[in-house]
Amino acid sequence: MRKLIASTFASLDGIMQAPGGPEEDPVGGFAFGGWAFAYWDECMDTSASGFDGKDRELVLGRRTYEIFEAYWPYQPADSPIAKTLNAAKKHVASRTLTALGWNNSTLLQGDVVSAVTALKTQSGLDLQVIGSGNLMQTLQAASLIDEYNVWTFPVVLGRGKRLFGETAKPLALRLIRSQVSTTGVVMSTYV
């Protein structure tokens, strides 16, 4: 059975909404988009393998898919992350999209929990959810996530979409890897 790995950025108080920019996810009046960039350093560039989809198939929510699809295909061809994400097979959970324009992308059919459960039973590369907060919470509530890559940034946002929301089940996780960037970002992997 394939593993499902969830990878996300989170603030110290567990907010994962819009780390990349102010326009990324302003839902609910969230005004702090782009909070992660002030903390980026070279250590994080070399540790980005937990987020780059390398040797994995991606499982993305609609919003994350649309953000990635509008950005990564247009990055320089020599960018290792762009090259990997553009080549990766992408499974997209959406109730509204009917067609996908990014290469190697397919829509998950039917109920997302059933669709991801079926993907996990197929042979192939491990599966990775990147960002995709609503999708991640749905998959966590269904006990489908096997591993968490969480980069915790030393910032408190106070409000926004949380990594573990109201539907979260209690979890006892074990830390298997941890590294700290020069800016205080804690890059952790839990199973």
Language model features with spans:
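Portal/gating segments that form or line small-molecule/metal binding sites
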Residues: 1-144, 154-191
